[in-house]
Amino acid sequence: MSSNTDAEIQLLQSIKEKAAAAGTQNSAASTSGSSSDSKITRESSAFSRREITNDVPIVSSAYSEVKEAPAWVKKDTPVDKYDKYGSRPAVSTSSGPSRVSRPESESTDNKYSKYISRAAEPSTRVKRSREEFEREEPDPREYGNSRIEQEKDDDGGAAIPYSNLDVSNQSYDHRTLQSREYYTFQSHISNKEERDINSIVRTHYNQRAVHSKRQVRKNSPIIKMRNFNNAIKYMLLGNYSKREQGVDRPFTFLDLCCGKGGDLNKCQFLEIDQYIGIDISDVSVKEAFQRYSQKKVRFRSAYGQKPRKDELRYDFEACFATGDCFSKTIPELLEPNFPGIIDKTFPVDTVSIQFSLHYAFETEDKVRTILTNVSRSLRPGGKFIGTIPSSDFIRKKIVTKNYLPDDRGKKKFGNSLYSVTFDKEPPEDGVFRPPFGNKYNYSLKDAIDDVPEYVVPFETLRAMCEDVGMELKLKKNFIDIFNQEIPKYFSKLSKHLIEGMKRSDGKYGAEGEEKEAVGFYIGFVFEKLGS
């Protein structure tokens, strides 16, 4: 039994040894194959992991041959321009610069681009170059077609909501656009023939207000004429707009058809206490308010002395309203937004209407409404001061038949700066009967683009002012006003304004075609009667 047992044990050991030997060979073969595969993989990955791995993101590397540009140099699809804060770029772990070439369309001179996500996309950057800004902004010559015509007001006009104005976007840099080539203003008013005068005028001046913010005023082709007209207004207002003597009450100035607030500086010159501006153009009123707000007076420390007011800023109070003063009363326009203003600030010392009264002469009712507004707003002795086209000038052009050729066969006069085109055949004697509704289209280069206006027969204006208790004090054309008043005002007006009226002969005033264009206007002053 012992012999059998020993034989069985030897047999079992032999079987185990053979099995162990077979397992060792298989293990060796397996180890050899795995080592070979690992070697191949390492050799492949040494050239490029991207060739065998699809789920690994592309990483810029100085040693890899990249077939696709990294995400941070790609030009993405444009996004909303207010989406300035893109996600942070992934930080590359590679050492050394990438050999990846930028696309030809990509700018290579922006040294900050590698730190900004989607650096090539202009609209995602907080601070953008002038060239990129200009590429995005509409050409001023195309502005009317691109945006203004997209917004319609209640009358079918193209009034722009405040939310679309540049003045409501404090990050908008107007100086950028103003550095470009100057483009003269041209309005874009659709269906003009079907609109009433209010809609046309409102739309025109809305567009004009937006356009002017994109231009440098001194580059205007009529800058000398603008300066001349401003000097005339300084002279008229300076001579006749006065504080009431012997009465302790604020010096108040009512600016009807105030536009963009172009006479705010003149009110500071007059040292008024309270300004009220009303205009039919909502965009112009918004611009006037912003102009006032930006220059509202601040007080400077004098280190122990009495505080001094900044002479370059406005130290009067002001309020602004949008409305048609030719069809509504002043209380109707002001009281809804400024309750109690009539009782607190009226009557006023001066009412001013500059280059606008002629629009009222469409109808007798409009003229009576505006003159009633003026008279009821003024204190006794207060002044009504304005500028209008001269009916005498128009009559002379008609009588002498001093007309220009017109493609439509209509009667037209003027020069390269301005033109007057009559809607109907004018009377041969130049006297319009009846005195209302005598329309012509007026154009002034870079200012008024073929807008309907109405002849203002001055004797009719005088008679209607007398009907509401106002007496004529002055009627004079611009050239005569300037020649008479410039010696007095030469030292009072700013050097910039004076130098802006310098003629080719070294003297000051208007010359050539500008002289005829400014000669189209007169200034007037009426005084409110009573005690």
Curated annotation (Swiss-Prot):
Taxonomic superkingdom: Eukaryota
* Record-annotated mRNA cap 0 methyltransferase domain positions: 220-529
For this record, the Gene Ontology CC terms, alphabetical, are: cytosol; nucleus
Which residues bind mRNA per the record? 229-230
Could you say which residues bind S-adenosyl-L-methionine here?
233, 257, 279, 324, 354, 359
Its annotated compartments are: Nucleus
* Main subcellular location: nucleus
Q: Where is this site: mRNA cap binding?
A: 260, 266, 291, 358, 453, 521
Instruction: Offer one Pfam family short name for this entry.
Output: mRNA_G-N7_MeTrfase
Instruction: Report the EC code(s) recorded for this entry.
Output: 2.1.1.56
Q: What class of enzyme is it?
A: transferase
Composition bias (Low complexity) maps to 20-36
Reaction it catalyzes = a 5'-end (5'-triphosphoguanosine)-ribonucleoside in mRNA + S-adenosyl-L-methionine = a 5'-end (N(7)-methyl 5'-triphosphoguanosine)-ribonucleoside in mRNA + S-adenosyl-L-homocysteine
Could you tell me the keywords of this UniProt record?
A: Methyltransferase, mRNA capping, mRNA processing, Nucleus, RNA-binding, S-adenosyl-L-methionine, Transferase
Residue ranges for the region (Disordered) are 18-165
| Single GO molecular function | RNA binding
Compositionally biased region (Basic and acidic residues): 65-86, 101-112, 129-150
Q: Which cysteine residues pair off into disulfide bonds?
A: none
Question: What function does this protein fulfil?
Answer: Responsible for methylating the 5'-cap structure of mRNAs.
What protein family does this chain belong to?
A: Belongs to the class I-like SAM-binding methyltransferase superfamily. mRNA cap 0 methyltransferase family.
The protein in question is named: mRNA cap guanine-N(7) methyltransferase
From what organism does this protein derive? Scheffersomyces stipitis (strain ATCC 58785 / CBS 6054 / NBRC 10063 / NRRL Y-11545)
